[in-house]
Design a protein with these regions (language model features):
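Domain-length accessory/inserted modules outside core catalytic folds
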Residues: 1-130
Length: 130
């Protein structure tokens, strides 16, 4: 008898879908190896869950899924790779994904202050600003 094992990535996806159905989340960002993308898409489509796809490097794929109104906002905000988002776009995305709000605020301030190259000591009035 042969046992079929479910890859960890797909177990994570199934947990996200469960949380979405229970109302724990309104939107999810699921990153997986592209080799699992077809299975992930089949699972989402079979349950009628709307989704968006975004390449994430050579091997990975970002799959956003959840409430349609959230995905419409994501479609407008996330128009380039995640590492190229502005501090404001990054903050909005994190808040929409339900990340800890205080941690998002700290991340935003750190990214915003770090833009001038002084390490955040200038309080936004750095003479080194580009």
């Amino acid at each position: 008898m042969r046992t079929i094992t479910t890859p960890v990535e797909l177990k994570v996806l199934m947990n996200h879908i469960y949380e979405l159905h229970k109302g724990v989340r309104h939107m999810v960002l699921f990153t997986c190896n592209k080799k699992y993308s077809e299975l992930a898409i089949q699972r989402l489509e079979s349950q009628g869950i709307p989704y968006l796809l975004q390449p994430a490097g050579q091997q990975n794929l970002n799959v956003y899924f959840g409430r349609r109104e959230c995905l419409e906002a994501i479609r407008l905000i996330v128009t380039r790779p995640l590492n190229q988002l502005t501090p404001e776009e990054d903050f909005i995305l994190g808040a929409m994904l339900g990340y800890d709000l205080c941690a998002q605020c700290e991340r935003y301030c750190k990214r915003k202050k770090g833009k001038c190259g002084c390490g955040g000591t200038c309080d936004g009035h750095c003479i080194n600003k580009n």
